[in-house]
Amino acid sequence: MNKKFVAAGMAAAMAATMLPSMAFADEKPTVTLLVPEYNAGKSLKNEGSDQVIQMVEDYTGFNFDIKWGDNGAYDQVIGTTLMDFDNMPMIITCGGSMNGTIVSAAEEGAFWDLSEYLDDSEKFPNLSQVNKETLKGLTVGGEVIGIPRVRELGRYGFSYRQDWADKLGLGTPETIQDVYDMLYAFTYNDPDGNNVDDTYGMEMTKYTGPFDIVQTWFGCGNGWVEQDGQLVPVHQTAEYKEAIDWLKKVYDDGLMSPDWVTIDTSEWSNGCKKGQNGVYIDVMDGGRRIWDYFVNNDVKSVTNPDEFASMNLLGPINGKTLATSGYNGYYLITTDGAKTEEDVINALTFLDKLNDYDMLILADYGLEGVTYNWTEDGQIETIEGETSDRPNLGLNQMVAYIPGYPEDKKPLKPTERDDALTECYEQRTRPVAVTNPALAYLSGSETYSKYGADLDNILSEARTQYICGVIDEQGLQDAWDDWANKGGNDLIAEVNEAYAADQETAEADENTEAATEEAATEEAATEEATSQAE
């Protein structure tokens, strides 16, 4: 990072006159990073950014040097970086989930195994609180190589227009049949009371994520499911077929827009905001944002013009909902950049300290008196200004948000909508979110690293075509056979080979632990007997 401080030049001049033993007495170690640039070259380059940088360095005890990578070609940037062994950063920030490039590099020893470090709560009080289930998706060959940028595990679910439901006398849906009845009523029973047939129950665009959520209601799992000791892709289960048959009925009965496959993803949620749809199946914070829109744009309830329209952030249906991977992006510690264990500890300490409360405030809100002020009741009040001009712009890309803000120190006063979302996560979605048991094994599969995108696309397109009636059951089966022949069967074999090895290791660990406990019990009994004899 190019930082131009007048003081730096003065310090350098003074250092030249000091004794060698004193010259570097206060010099901080440097941590180097590769970070994606989302802000057109403005990240940590705005007015006031130098102050932000200095605050980070003073707080963490480390200087830091960032190479910003073009987000539009970031995968290529990472690939090039991994080949430049002489200029390797200590920390590489990655987006999304692991791909073949990262897996291949990990298998060649490009990254440190962080398993033991992330168990050390004394050295890393924040990072050690990471959800161990989430780490399974960042594991290659039994080694945890990534630190996740945490996202809510129970983020997906079902939300709907509460005032529409009230007008039509509908209760809270619990079963799949309840959902169908609500979709039907929202489509055909004039929920907005305008005497015009202009609504569809379920909002849909070409983004098909809602279908994955619906599938969990039927018990078919999340991508893969464990059956009889084997991991099986969900499209090979009876429950999957039941789920897409139900979705086909929803489509055939006109309960979603007939042209949903042509509606661009950028329009997602606009149907609910504009009063064209009443059910939103996606991230729960998306339902909250629709509710925010109603409040901010004075959209009135259809049952009470003195109140705003509202969304019920329900969450699961039939006691289930889809889990996220638990993260969106991650950090790698490279073996060529962090050459020693001391380097690894420095890199992890830097990342850990960035998750302290003061650093979260700096990353999220910037400088007090410049971009925010504290209110008398201890809440943050932001100061108006262009987000792209904020001095902290881009700093949040280095924050894992583990464990995030303490519940008793939330910087923004929660609204009714915020409280409803928190309640949904804590009491409803998080406890029942269905995880993908194959997540860790997919990242280590050679077939998936090469052909995963194509294989996923075959299944997704076949599902869409079947729901819309473009293909029949035979066409659906043909697509599944195509999936199997183009690498699907190999993928199943690789995933289950890794799964079986993992199960054997876990069983061996359990046996060792049991033997250790038994030996300790016998030793204690022997000591007690000896003591009594004496």
What do the PLM-derived regions correspond to, one by one?
Residues 63-69, 258-259, 309-312:
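General small-molecule cofactor/ligand-binding pocket signal
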Residues 7-8, 21-178, 212-213, 223-226, ...:
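Conserved N-terminal structural module of periplasmic/extracytoplasmic solute-binding proteins
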Residues 139-209, 224-271, 280, 333-348, ...:
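Helix-loop-helix "hinge/cap" segment bordering the ligand-binding cleft or interdomain interface
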Residues 1-9:
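Positively charged n-region of N-terminal signal peptides that target proteins for export
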Residues 89-93, 278-283:
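Paired acidic/hydrophobic, glycine-rich loop segments that form the ligand-binding mouth/hinge
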Residues 36, 349-465, 470:
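Conserved small-residue motifs centered on glycine
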Residues 37-48, 52-56, 154, 166-172, ...:
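Extracytoplasmic/periplasmic substrate-binding proteins
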Residues 10-18:
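Hydrophobic core
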